[in-house]
Swiss-Prot record:
Glycans are attached at residue 74. GO terms for cellular component: collagen-containing extracellular matrix; extracellular region. Residues 221-261 form the EGF-like domain. The gene is MATN1. This is Matrilin-1. It is found in: Secreted, Extracellular space, Extracellular matrix. It comes from Gallus gallus. Residues 24-220, 262-450 form the VWFA domain.
Length: 493
């Protein structure tokens, strides 16, 4: 019911509520996460380049991952190797058998603050941390051997050969790089496929955002959709440890998260939609191609024509560039072709400047916007803005634009919330990995499905008017009866 207010008498509101005009609040989806038995060793860099407050962020990340595991002698065992110029075994796979003990032990870890001997640390993992004397179990298809390496610098020793030996020994290696880390080194360390095993964040302040990825990586569960253990009305989609509901083409998911309603947005509804896309250097060329696929995924769900949906596209970095205005292309095919041709700008992240452009130009009549047609902006960014966004973000919403904020990687949650329309939880999305933005695209497809008459106000108002007419007629009759009674009383007296 965005942007629509129906002023009704209390009695009528209660009647409508009892008849189910408004849906119940969203229900939580089912969850069931069980981790496959795993010998997990964290290998964490605490060299002098990692400041004490940054090292605390690493400890928070470790704790968050551990919180999502089934910890125990017969399930997941956890060890931690701390390294700099030397290697310190903080605790072994056999040391702690409960989650509470592990979390307390992580909090006691202190940085070593010297050099960066990453190869030495990986060798220690092979020869010591994953040995049976330290609590590792015999190599088996039923038990995962996993190492997570976290580093922020270039190693002072070789990593390629020792990492290859670790992988040959059956150890699956994830490499997380922070800040000015050497990406080539991360690729030498990590297991294949590299896209799944190499992660990068700009700073330790955002490393915690990778938590969800690793919780999902360790989560195994039976297919709840296949077993029928769900309450989706139309389509059930399995996710690690849970499931989500979706709807068939032509339907949109209701607020309860499980039932579907026919969506009239594809036939007869007008919409002016502008994408505001971050093309800064931190996105990287291969990820920018994924962003273009994300845009076209949403475009594919629209009915594009002069009377229905119009699409515009703006890219920004240190400056703002309009790729094409609203209404330039009259069909989906031409829009998608133009998106594919969009060149990557690189450079900085001036989100505030881009939002100002959206407000001042993108939704102007001169750029194809239509008076009286709903305006929707989708802002996509992967990092902290280098300028001020508050005023432009507020103005966009004050003007009635419906704003969605999509963040990936190092995007700042507070900025996403500031951009997003109310209710904020329904208008901002975040993922740590560009490869999963298609999941957000599916959610946005349903969100921007515009109902021709979202709260059926016309019908309700007609009903309200009829009721009020009947009440007025009844009041007039009662007044007439009262006057007659009064006249009779006067005659009797």
């Amino acid at each position: 019911m965005d942007g629509i207010f129906c002023a009704l008498p209390l009695s009528l509101l209660l009647l409508l509520q009892s008849c189910g005009v408004w849906g119940a609040p969203p229900q939580p989806r089912g969850t069931l996460c069980r981790t496959k038995p795993t010998d997990l060793v964290f290998i964490i860099d605490s060299s002098r380049s990692v400041r004490p407050q940054e090292f605390e962020k690493v400890k928070v990340f470790l704790s968050r991952v551990i919180e999502g595991l089934d910890v125990g002698p017969n399930s997941t065992r956890v060890g931690v190797i701390n390294y700099a110029s030397a290697v310190k075994n903080e605790f072994s796979l056999k040391t702690h058998q409960t989650k509470a003990e592990l979390l307390q032990a992580v909090q006691r870890i202190e940085p070593l603050s010297t050099g960066t001997m990453t190869g030495l640390a990986i060798q220690f993992a092979i020869s010591r941390a994953f040995s049976d004397t330290e609590g590792a179990r015999l190599r088996s298809p039923n038990i995962n051997k996993v190492a997570i390496v976290v580093t922020d610098g270039r190693p002072q020793d070789g990593v390629q050969d020792v990492s290859a030996r670790a992988r040959q020994a059956g150890i699956e290696i994830f490499a997380i790089g922070v800040g000015r880390v050497d990406m080539h080194t991360l690729r030498q360390i990590a297991s294949e496929p590299l896209d799944d095993h190499v992660d990068y964040v700009e700073s330790y302040s955002v490393i915690e955002k990778l938590t969800h990825k690793f919780q999902e990586a360790f989560c195994v569960v039976s297919d709840l959709c296949a077993t029928g253990d769900h309450d989706c009305e139309q389509i059930c989609i399995s996710t690690p440890g849970s499931y989500k509901c979706a709807c068939k083409e032509g339907f949109t998911l209701n607020n309860d998260g499980k039932t579907c309603s026919a969506c009239s947005g594809g036939s007869g509804s007008a919409l002016d939609l502008v994408f505001l896309i971050d093309g800064s250097k931190s996105v990287r060329p291969e990820n920018f191609e994924l962003v273009k696929k994300f845009i076209n995924q949403i475009v594919e769900s629209l009915e594009v024509s002069e009377k229905q949906a119009q699409v515009g596209l703006v890219q920004y970095s240190s400056s703002v560039r309009q790729e094409f205005p609203l209404g330039q292309f009259k069909n989906k095919k031409d829009i998608k072709a133009a998106v594919k041709k969009m060149a990557y700008m690189e450079k900085g992240t001036m989100t505030g400047q881009a939002l100002k452009y959206l407000v001042d130009s993108s939704f102007s009549i001169a750029n194809g916007a239509r008076p009286g047609v709903p305006k929707v902006g989708i802002v996509f960014t992967d990092g902290r803005s280098q300028d001020y966004i508050t005023d432009a973000a507020k103005k966009a919403k004050d003007l009635g634009f419906r704003m969605f904020a999509v963040g990936v990687g190092n995007a700042v949650e507070d900025e996403l919330r500031e951009i997003a329309s109310e209710p904020v939880a329904e208008h901002y999305f975040y993922t740590a990995d560009f490869r999963t933005i298609s999941n957000i695209g599916k959610k946005l497809q349903m969100k921007i499905c515009v109902e021709e008459d979202p709260c059926e106000c016309k019908s309700i108002v007609k009903f309200q008017t009829k009721v009020e007419e009947l009440i007025n007629t009844l009041q007039q009759k009662l007044e007439a009866v009262a006057k007659r009674i009064e006249a009779l009383e006067n005659k009797i007296i």
